[in-house]
Every structure is written in structure tokens, then in C-alpha cells.
């Protein structure tokens, strides 16, 4: 829950997180920038793909079995990356709405800071590279190449935000430069995974960008 508005879910993880086909995170209670009020609509416990790092309970042995949070990420997407690795080794994650935590969003980097944009794009691409099944990797990365540049130019032309425009370009450039550093880990993850792919209930088959911007589906309940 948000400290600023106690009746609203918090952006970072709301009531449990999922991914779309192309790696865009969304939550019960938050889709992109649309954050819902808590009206009891998500009061049931649910299996999720990821939980926010702001409020997560995990067995120590499981944390260290996947080498914990990846410190190279610094911030943003690092908990999603770890949760995905946990899922590949056969663990399941649940959101339990009976517990309630109030979180101050943007404490590390405030919204509007180009570094926040940079880390979100770079780390999200890195997370995909580390964890996607081999048969999906090249297709998803090609689509993301297109979507990322559409996002960059939309930011520049419609929002006149030069800082975020440059941040997205730098994020893609730096991802291409440092992805080889993660190649050994990727091979290890693929070799040791006990689940061939994440269920479509947790990593969906739809494109969240299309659903949100073209179909105007702004809340979790409205998604396919």
C-alpha cells in the first residue's frame, strides 16, 4: 500500500506481480502508471510470478540457492529477476493480502529521474536475457528492440523529454555491451531449470503495451 495514499496500492508491487510475453511487469492493482484503489477486489491469496522487494519473505536456503539478488542491477527489476530464477528451480511465490505493508515509492530514485528510466530498461532487458527459454529469446528480443525505440521516440516527440529519450538509448547500448557477462549464467539457468516455461497465467501471452494503449484496458481485471 502507498504511504502517500493509504487507500491505494503501491506502484512497486501492488498485490502481486506478473509479466507479459515481452517482459513488461504488471500487478494486481497496478498496470503501467494506472494504480487502483484497494476496494477489496484482490483480497484472495494468489500465486504470482514475482513479489516486490519492498515486502518479501523467502527461505534463506532458497535465496542462496539462486545466489540472491543480482547486485549488478543496483535497482529496478532485480527482485523480478530473482523471483523468475526461483520459479525455474521449482519454487512458487504467493501474494497474501491478509498482510499489509506501507511503502514509500521512489526512495532510491524519484520518478522523472532519467537514471530511473535507464535502469528500468537496461535491467529489464538483462532479466529477459538471463531467464527466457532459448526458443523464445530471439523473437522476444527483436520485438523489444522495436517497442523500446517506439517508447524512446514517443517520449521525445510527445513528452519533449530529452533526458528519458537519451536514457533509453543508453540502456539499449549498455545492455548490448554487457550481456556477454551474463552468458555463462544464462547457460547454467537453462541447464538447471526444472520447469520448461512459466505458466501463461503468470507470464501471459498477450502484449501489455497493446492492451493498455490500444485497447485502453487500464486495470488488472480488464486484461485478457
Protein language model regions, located:
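A short, conserved alpha-helix in the catalytic core of glycosyltransferases
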Residues: 43-100
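Short helix-loop capping/hinge motifs at secondary-structure junctions, enriched
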Residues: 36, 62-65, 134
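Long, low-complexity C-terminal extensions of enzymes
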Residues: 183-224
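Short, flexible, basic/aromatic active-site loop/helix in glycosyltransferases
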Residues: 17-48
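Conserved donor NDP-sugar-binding/catalytic core segment of glycosyltransferases
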Residues: 1-25
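Short glycine/serine/threonine-enriched helix-capping/active-site loop
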Residues: 1-2, 28, 96, 104
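Active-site-adjacent helix/loop segment of glycosyltransferases
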Residues: 89-196
